[in-house]
Amino acid sequence: MTLSGKRISKGIGIGEVLCIRKNFDKIISREKIDFSQVDSEISKFNKAKSKAIEALRDLERKAMLQFGDDKKGIFEGQVLIVEDDELDELVIELIVKENYSAAYSIYLAFENLVKSVEDYKDPYLKERASDYKDIRNRLISIILGQVSDFSEINKDIILVTEELTPSDTMQFDLNYVKGFLTAVGGETSHAAILARTMGLPALVMTLSDIDALKDGDKIVIDAMSSIVIKNPSSDEINLYEGKILRQVELEKELFSLKDKDAETKDGTKVFLKANIGTPVDITYVNKYGVEGIGLFRTEFLYMRSLQPPTEDEQFETYKRVIETMEKKGVVTIRTLDVGGDKEIPYLNFKKEENPFLGFRALRMYKEYEELIQAQFNAIFRASHYGKIRVMVPMLTIYEEIETIEYFVNNAKINLKSRGLPFDENLEVGCMIEVPSAALISSKLANKLKFFSIGTNDLTQYVLAVDRGNQKISNLYDKYNPAVLKLIKKVLDDGVSSGIDVSVCGELGGDDAGALLLVGLGFRSLSMIPSATLRIKYLLKKYTIMELEELANKVLNSDSKQETLSYFDKFIGD
């Protein structure tokens, strides 16, 4: 029996199915409790909190031993959420005023938080909902007495679950985990990131296919072909064991490139940087030997608690990342990118019919001046401790330069008045992700020190396509000549003005996309850390002239199919 799925991490794995089921919504009682039970339920909640914090501290230690110091940050963040006073207030209010049980009150308290995050269009932010579900499930399982222990597993397994959370993976000896199958998640999900870090295959499948797999089923995950073979024959097992051996050899070759420069066959240097979303991701940065951070998303700081982060909290986070990256390249910090589709509950954004065209990112800064100024202050304070740059999202019109200058100047005045040191020459740049900004890039280059092109949003704005809409997904094409010509214009304008221009969208970490961008003239790309070794491997196979010829063909392509055929012939496997 063969099942299909969507690949989120390449590779091949063979093992027995081990299912993790979490259907708490189906087993928690919705019945009202008697008034006499209120104190007892509050006590259950408080005891569950204490046990959860104890367990999370233990997971911190395990994570540090298994993955290094930075990985423990996932569980440090979860402890902060469990300890949050506002969570206490929400749960206790539901117990006291609504007379719900502790378990159901916890479920409801997290439900709105989870839904608000799942509504995000940004895939990275959307998938942070798994952290909230992880905490919710832990608290409820403690109250219901359903805490599972998988620490004694000592055979090769494939983890199968509706959604993989950070805690799930820490319950296992990962030497025995050979792959992941989930019903929820994308390329930025915990399952995907962990799988790529470990070099394991992972697929997202339909819930019905997930349910068709039972504990003990022997399966093969072929994430190269995006299939799962249930109960494979001995011939199929032999075939895939051979493929796994060849895969191991290729991995060795890729990791031999870790400390070498990324360059073309004829020696043209290309800087490969990392996109990260939390300090935890520094683990992967170090593993793959990237040359700086091209995009440090800061939204996690605003999502890990039920209240906004303080200036000091942000400063400490930025400082830690900068010091960890010392001598490994510049850290580019993107200021807050929320609004519309990226709602944060305590900011009270109104629902909009067109969130992608609405009140978001730079457009909301003046209305939330105190919040944004605290971030600029924190970034400027951190600039004293290493080489960083600050990048503002979604600049649309030239006049918005004044908004950027307002916060920059206020940060400098504020820090000077407090006697705090900072880098007077801190570079300020912007994301180019709106066509209007791309079209005036020559003018913007006179005011800013660098551009970073966000190809994901730019593509859907240029083509007027919602990439999440399956009915028109065929129109979303990151290789479309109209998109590429606009990207090329921004590069040329930046180079003419003497400023740095890089790409931080998914195009830069895509095999064909990276080669194409270098052919267009880019010498700086930012991507998920695990993509860098593969890109290094590919770059050294081609000369600049060959890549320029490829780019020229794609720029003049008449169809998506024609473009893909060029890539197939050029790259092969």
From Swiss-Prot:
Give GO terms: molecular function aspect only: kinase activity; metal ion binding; phosphoenolpyruvate-protein phosphotransferase activity
State the PROSITE patterns in the record: PEP_ENZYMES_2, PEP_ENZYMES_PHOS_SITE
A Pfam family hit: PEP-utilizers
Question: Does the entry annotate any disulfide bonds, and if so which pairs?
Answer: none
Give GO terms for biological process.
phosphoenolpyruvate-dependent sugar phosphotransferase system
Q: Which SUPFAM superfamilies match?
A: Enzyme I of the PEP:sugar phosphotransferase system HPr-binding (sub)domain, Phosphoenolpyruvate/pyruvate domain, Phosphohistidine domain
Show the active-site residues.
Answer: H190 (tele-phosphohistidine intermediate), C504 (proton donor)
The miscellaneous annotation reads: The reaction takes place in three steps, mediated by a phosphocarrier histidine residue located on the surface of the central domain. The two first partial reactions are catalyzed at an active site located on the N-terminal domain, and the third partial reaction is catalyzed at an active site located on the C-terminal domain. For catalytic turnover, the central domain swivels from the concave surface of the N-terminal domain to that of the C-terminal domain.
Q: Which family does it belong to?
A: Belongs to the PEP-utilizing enzyme family.
Job of this protein: General (non sugar-specific) component of the phosphoenolpyruvate-dependent sugar phosphotransferase system (sugar PTS). This major carbohydrate active-transport system catalyzes the phosphorylation of incoming sugar substrates concomitantly with their translocation across the cell membrane. Enzyme I transfers the phosphoryl group from phosphoenolpyruvate (PEP) to the phosphoryl carrier protein (HPr).
Query: What assembly does the database describe for this protein?
Result: Homodimer.
Protein name per UniProt: Phosphoenolpyruvate-protein phosphotransferase
